[in-house]
């Protein structure tokens, strides 16, 4: 998604972008298109039962916007705090010598491979379906449009290789994926986008994710 940094003319904004076509109280957006019939259509496509992990591993050097961090810590019981200490050893607590490991994460949740809730972006002070920020933001989250309000996603997926259709291994910084780009990339596949489909775009930037440290963290996080 491109975020336009230039001033937006008032006439560029459709005045009736809310209420949603799915209803004034809707919090799921286009996921409403994943009907039971759509799920059945999707599962009938399965032939080999292969499972592909689309997520990147979270670690402290992952590409991120400035100010966002991910840290993971492991702590053990007090006998094992410092394994190089002269008193460190395998002895635990009690007659069965119990030891343990505790994991602690300190992170900005808007990082890595994830699915945004519809409360993430706003136009001015209004979110999806026209909800006002002042009405939904509370001390510990939002009372509407959180990721918990979205249904589970089981549907047909389409991978659109826009990097290849642009003639390269990855898009250039600043490239915007347009409808025409998507149509061009789809033309050679014989597929079209149907209501309820999950559309994934291959931009090529994921190939730089594992650089340690990332060569261009800002652009990798952006694209």
Task: Tell what function each PLM region has.
Residues 1-223:
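Active-/binding-site microenvironments in catalytic and ligand-binding cores
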């Amino acid at each position: 998604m491109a975020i336009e940094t230039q001033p937006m003319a008032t006439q560029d904004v459709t005045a009736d972008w809310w209420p949603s076509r799915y209803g004034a109280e809707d919090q799921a957006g286009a996921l409403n298109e994943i009907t039971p019939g759509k799920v059945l259509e999707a599962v009938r496509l399965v032939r080999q039962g292969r499972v592909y992990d689309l997520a990147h591993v979270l670690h402290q050097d992952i590409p991120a916007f400035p100010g966002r961090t991910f840290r993971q810590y492991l702590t053990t019981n007090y006998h094992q705090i410092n394994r190089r200490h002269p008193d460190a050893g395998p002895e635990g607590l009690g007659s069965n010598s119990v030891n343990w490991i505790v994991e602690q994460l300190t992170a900005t949740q808007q990082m890595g491979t994830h699915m945004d809730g519809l409360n993430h972006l706003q136009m001015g002070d209004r979110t999806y379906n026209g909800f006002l920020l002042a009405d939904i933001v509370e001390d510990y989250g939002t009372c509407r449009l959180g990721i918990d309000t979205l249904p589970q996603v089981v549907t047909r997926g389409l991978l659109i290789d826009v990097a290849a259709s642009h003639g390269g291994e990855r898009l250039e910084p600043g490239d915007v994926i347009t409808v025409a780009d998507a149509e061009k990339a789809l033309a050679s596949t014989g597929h079209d986008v149907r209501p309820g489909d999950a559309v994934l775009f291959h931009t090529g930037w994921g190939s730089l994710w594992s650089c340690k440290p990332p060569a261009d963290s800002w652009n990798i996080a952006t694209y």
